[in-house]
Amino acid sequence: IPQWFFQQSIPGTFTYHSLLTDIGIVQETPLREDLPETLRKLDSFLPYDLSHITNISKEIHKLKCMLIICDISPMGIVVARKAGIPSVLIENFTWDWVYENYVSTDFYAGKFVDYLRQIYNCVDYHIQTEPVCYYQNVDLSTAPISREVRTTSQQIRQKLSIPDGVKVVMITMGGIPEKYQFLEQLAYKRDIYFIVPGGSQTMRLIDNLVLLPRHSDYFHPDLINTCDAVIGKLGYS
């Protein structure tokens, strides 16, 4: 997760440390995975290097951290146990569940499924947020989590030159760069405005198209709040 995401989201002070915590799925595009490359990276990353985990746990002690919160990634659970502090897992899917659904293909990830599942089972406090992909017996189940809106939809419409009364649709690929080949066709839907984060390197307003860079001056939850519908990728389906 890039540093600017936290700068946009957290009002207080924080220290940002860049660290690879999981491989996930290597993607060629938002809609196409690279499974062979994913396997190569998993083979070099798992199981975790114990010396690496030890070094991170020592740094955790130096920083006087009292809790590790893990957003899907299981590495924090291992580090927390090594450091002797509690861990919290927040997820609506886990990587063992994702990899397990590929095992019947040429994606030979069975050994990673078992390894990661054992780690997830060791977490001190487990939270699942809707929409949940695989329900488990957890400590807390909750509604979807989101950042609070900061600017009204009316103000966003005015800033983006979107007329009152028209429908607005967002097209998003979850922050992964994509070349949209159909933007010209959307211009024919003149009664609908389309907001496309990542649709341009700079902000561009073209007829009914609002093309924004991936990291724009607009707070993403405000953009979503302005829309009547969102079209996006369905995760690792």
Residue ranges and their predicted role:
Residues 2-49:
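Conserved nucleotide-sugar phosphate-binding/catalytic loop shared by glycosyltransferases and other
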Residues 67-72, 89, 218-237:
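A donor-sugar binding/catalytic signature common to diverse glycosyltransferases
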